[in-house]
Amino acid sequence: MRNTVCCLFLLIFSTNAFSVNSNLILADSFPDKLSEFEFFVDDSAQEPHEKVIPYELISTLFSDYSYKQRWVYVPNNAKASYVKDWVFDFPEGSALIKTFYYPVDERNPDLGKQLLETRLLLRKKD
């Protein structure tokens, strides 16, 4: 019995049992905590889930010397569509995620980040 429980435990934690909560993206209400979306496997370190992809902009806006990290989540291997002279058309359940932060010490990035704010842009049903 103990071996069965251990195997089940390993199976659960080695699969995508803990993945992005796509249903919450489409929900009418917003959750109490950002972590309920499960975009990050480690919220405090901003370590994204494997299906949350980092991206960078070619040209960024100045934001009071803060740094930004950006990620995109597109559900179920769906794809965004490109429309010339317009914005990308993301499928329902997609999310753009942006976190503002300052380094704890500019001279030593290994000391971590002071997280300031995380913003979400959620693609809901039309």
Where are these regions (language model features)?
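Sec-dependent N-terminal signal peptides
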Residues: 4-13
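Sterically constrained small-residue positions within well-ordered secondary structures
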Residues: 10, 63, 109-111
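Bacterial Sec-dependent signal peptides at the C-terminal "C-region" and cleavage site
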Residues: 12-22
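N-terminal pre-domain segments of enzymes
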Residues: 20-70
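Sequence context of c-type cytochrome heme-c attachment sites
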Residues: 60, 77-79
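Extended surface/linker regions that mediate inter-domain or inter-protein docking
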Residues: 68-76, 83-126
